[in-house]
Regions:
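Ser/Thr/Pro-rich, acidic low-complexity intrinsically disordered regulatory segments
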Residues: 2-11, 36-40, 132-134
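N-terminal, charge-rich interaction modules
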Residues: 4-31
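Glycine- and acidic-residue-enriched helix-capping/strand-helix junction motifs
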Residues: 29-43
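Ser/Thr/Gly-rich flexible loops in soluble cytosolic domains mediating phosphotransfer, phosphorylation
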Residues: 43, 100-134
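A generic structural motif
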Residues: 53-58
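Short beta->alpha junction loops
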Residues: 59-68, 120-122
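Mid-chain, well-packed structural core segment of small domains
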Residues: 71-107
Length: 134
């Protein structure tokens, strides 16, 4: 017999989200004159705050252009189990970062094979990308 009263609900566990992105100070902003490292960092902080307010257990992990990116990603994935891994557009869409993107996909595949992958076009649509896979 349950000790819960009729109509009581059990909260679903929070979806754990790892948001991988290029460290803002490493982004090439030449194609984005209205953006800067400071503005991008603020957008990312705001996005993580909004994701947490929306009920996600979200963590942002910034990576470099390849020197330690795989190790940093592997360490983040070892720290806790993630349900969804979002790889940001800055890592995914810049042609010079293609091999880094491939490396990160493979690290996620190896270290978190059950995690769903999703992709955004900017920090502003990260929640929609996560919801597609959560």
């Amino acid at each position: 017999m349950s000790s819960r009263a009729a109509g009581d609900t059990v909260a679903a566990p929070m979806t754990a989200v790892l948001y991988l992105g290029l460290e803002p100070h490493l982004v090439d902003f030449s194609g984005f004159p209205d953006l800067s490292a400071e503005k991008l960092a603020a957008q990312l902080r705001e996005q993580v705050t909004q994701l947490r307010a929306a009920g996600f257990d979200a963590d942002f992990v910034g990576v470099d252009r390849g020197e330690t990116a795989a190790a940093v990603t592997a360490a983040a994935l070892a720290a806790k189990p993630y349900d969804v891994v979002l790889i940001g557009a800055g890592l995914r869409t810049a042609p010079p970062l293609l091999t880094l993107f491939e490396t990160l996909i493979n690290v996620v595949h190896e270290r978190a094979p059950r995690a769903r992958l999703c992709f955004n076009t900017s920090p502003r649509d990260s929640e929609a990308a996560i919801r597609r896979q959560a």
